[in-house]
Structure formats: structure tokens, C-alpha cells
From Swiss-Prot:
NCBIfam families for this protein: rpsB_bact
Start-end of Basic and acidic residues biased regions: 225-239
GO molecular function: structural constituent of ribosome
InterPro entries: Ribosomal_uS2, Ribosomal_uS2_bac/mit/plastid, Ribosomal_uS2_CS, Ribosomal_uS2_flav_dom_sf
Region (Disordered): 224-246
Protein name (Swiss-Prot/TrEMBL): Small ribosomal subunit protein uS2
Higher taxonomy: Bacteria, Bacillati, Bacillota, Bacilli, Bacillales
GO cellular component terms, semicolon-separated: cytosolic small ribosomal subunit
Keyword tags: Ribonucleoprotein, Ribosomal protein
Recorded family membership: Belongs to the universal ribosomal protein uS2 family.
Provenance organism: Bacillus licheniformis (strain ATCC 14580 / DSM 13 / JCM 2505 / CCUG 7422 / NBRC 12200 / NCIMB 9375 / NCTC 10341 / NRRL NRS-1264 / Gibson 46)
GO terms classed as biological process: translation
Gene3D superfamilies attached to this UniProt entry: Glucose-6-phosphate isomerase like protein, domain 1 (3.40.50.10490), Helix hairpin bin (1.10.287.610)
Amino acid sequence: MSVISMKQLLEAGVHFGHQTRRWNPKMKRYIFTERNGIYIIDLQKTVKKVEEAYNFTKNLAADGGKILFVGTKKQAQDSVKEEAERSGMYYVNQRWLGGTLTNFETIQKRIKRLKDIEKMQENGTFDVLPKKEVVQLKKELERLEKFLGGIKEMKELPDALFIIDPRKERIAVAEARKLNIPIIGIVDTNCDPDEIDVVIPANDDAIRAVKLLTSKMADAILEAKQGEESAETEAKEAETTETTTA
């Protein structure tokens, strides 16, 4: 059975590309036709590519790999946060801070600062500090949480990135490519598919389309994790049986 159906893709508007004047010729192989000045994406190809992305993500997660979800455009922010959290992965859904990957040590220092202020808030330090200082610390905490909250438990570089709109997230794409980190991407008709390792040709502007495809990647991760849990349970049961028999 397919990971996703043509009906689901149609209902979510995944097939609507950009206006014909705003296109990347490299996306030609994923375009079915043109209608009223808009390119229509070939959903048969999208079905296959979603399957490919699903299996890639599932296999990576089964090996203990970590995936960073990236989507800072308004249509993607909520889905990226919800689905990354649901699958126990990391996310960036506000501004991508330059150097998030390529200057990882500096980013880790900012994350440490975020955690230090959180501790101060929790252990009562705020209660003994001057009010003015507390106000400044709270503002700093809010800003750090906004930009780094989704990666504050990311102790090392991710094993892959899942990106919504690589054109919008071109800095993230450039950093991942520089470090040879594979990229899975929702790629619309105005994007360059050559920059992405696993291309999902799809509408990257419709909230429903973004939600549907992002949730499928989270499902792949959860399926891999459930497989791990089942294997662990079976191993424990086998051990118990052996002990009892002995």
C-alpha cells in the first residue's frame, strides 16, 4: 500500500505549482501541465517521491539518526513545530540563524546561555535580582527560546534536514551541502531540485499541503521508533523465556 494516496494529495492542493513565469526549468520533469498560467505538478511522481522520502527517513531514524525540520515561512511554522515535536526531532521555524550548522560551536554557546537563564528562572535567582535585570533576562530568554527552542537539545549536527521551500531556506541548504548533510525537501516549481537529495515535488505555499507532507515524514520516524521498541520487547521476552527454561 502507498504511503500517501493521490486523493490525499489532490484534496490538500499539493498539485498547484507557481505561475508559469516564476519557474525553474529544472523542475520540468515534475510538471504535468499548465492551467490558467499556473503549473500543475505531476502527482504520480509526487506519490513515488513521497514514498522514497518516507523510506529514506524511516531507515535513517531506525539507525538512530536525527532529523532537523526546517520551515520558517508562515505556512510552515506550525506544522514544522508540531510534527518535529510529535516525532521527537528538532526544528527551526523562525529565522534560520546563519551558522546554525557551519558554526555549530557558537550556536551551542547561545543554547547554553538559554539553558542558564532557564535555570535562573527555575531556581529562584530571579527573585533576588533587581527588577530591571530580571526584565532584561526575560526578554533575552524569550528571544533565545524563539530562535533556538527547537534545537536546544541538539547536542551534535543532525543526520539529515527536512526542508520546506529550499529557495526560502537557501542558507540552510548551503550549510547542509557544505557539510554533506543529506536534504529531503518539499520542492515547488520555482525551486532548484539539484540542490536536494530527496525531492518531493509539491506546493510549498498551501498550509494543508505542507501539513500533510510534513506529517508523513513524522510518521516515518515514529514507525521506525515503534520498530525499535518492538525489537527490544521481543529481545527481552526471549531473554525471559531462556531464563525460565534454564
